[in-house]
A protein has these predicted regions:
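Short, structured active-site "lid" loops
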Residues: 1-13
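Structural motif
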Residues: 2-4, 64-66, 147-151, 173-175, ...
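Short glycine-rich anion-binding loops that position phosphate/pyrophosphate groups of nucleotides
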Residues: 7-9, 39-41, 155, 179-180
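Cap/lid and interdomain-hinge subdomains that line or gate substrate/regulatory clefts
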Residues: 13-15, 21-34, 40-158
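Long, charged alpha-helical interface segments
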Residues: 161-163
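Acidic, glycine-rich loop-and-beta core segments that form the ion-binding/anion-interacting portion
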Residues: 165-203
Length: 203
């Protein structure tokens, strides 16, 4: 199930209310994967909308966040968003007429809008085993972190993070342009069962 909020270029309060209300309306205990789709160049009310979905679900889950889309040239390294190897603030996105991006640090962008404790899942962690990544998530969850901003350069990182999120057994949402959500959703299906509409929810 997918709902379009058209909230990228509206006020923060309106964006929050749209995401919060739609999540409340359609949330269900059988949904495995909640996705807050975000722009791969971080335009819009990203932090606000992540908070809105987490607030609506109200079960102390985490947000796994990355604007990376490796196959489209979007990567995150050291917390910085690169577009075809160039910092996003040095691309045409910096002069976007509606949502100019002046900062390439993903954590700084989200911190400016979110009330939650944020941590970077750096490339040093992402390159390690699934078990190490899962333990990192669990340990930092116990320390109070609720938003995990993931470095991501290639498909291997997408696979490892996806497996680790599920292995951690911690409830989550995913905020990304789609590749991470797609992989987690794929791994959430136990063949030959087919995912029903109740299993996946995206905004």
């Amino acid at each position: 199930m997918s709902c379009s909020t058209e909230s990228r270029s509206i006020s923060e309060s309106d964006a929050y209310n749209k995401v919060f209300n739609i999540t409340k309306k359609y949330m269900h205990e059988n949904i495995i994967v909640y996705n807050k789709r975000i722009d791969s160049t971080m335009r819009g009310n990203v932090g606000i909308e992540i908070d809105a979905m987490l607030d609506a679900l109200d079960d102390d889950r985490i947000a796994i966040v990355s604007p990376a889309y490796p196959s489209a040239g979007r990567t995150v390294v050291g917390g910085y968003l690169l577009v075809n190897g160039v910092l996003v603030e040095d691309t045409e996105m910096a002069v976007d007429s509606k949502n100019p991006i002046k900062i390439s640090n993903v954590i700084d962008l989200i911190k400016a809008q979110s009330k939650r404790k944020i941590i970077s899942m750096s490339i040093d962690i992402v390159r390690k085993s699934v078990k190490v990544i899962a333990n990192f998530i669990k340990d930092k969850y116990e320390e109070g972190f609720r938003i995990f901003v993931c470095d991501m350069i290639n498909e291997n990182h997408i696979n490892s993070i996806s497996q680790a999120v599920l292995e951690s057994k911690i409830k989550f949402i995913v905020a990304d342009p789609s590749p991470l959500t797609a992989k987690i959703s794929e791994l959430s299906i136990t063949p030959p069962r087919i995912m029903s509409r109740e299993k996946y929810y995206a905004l």
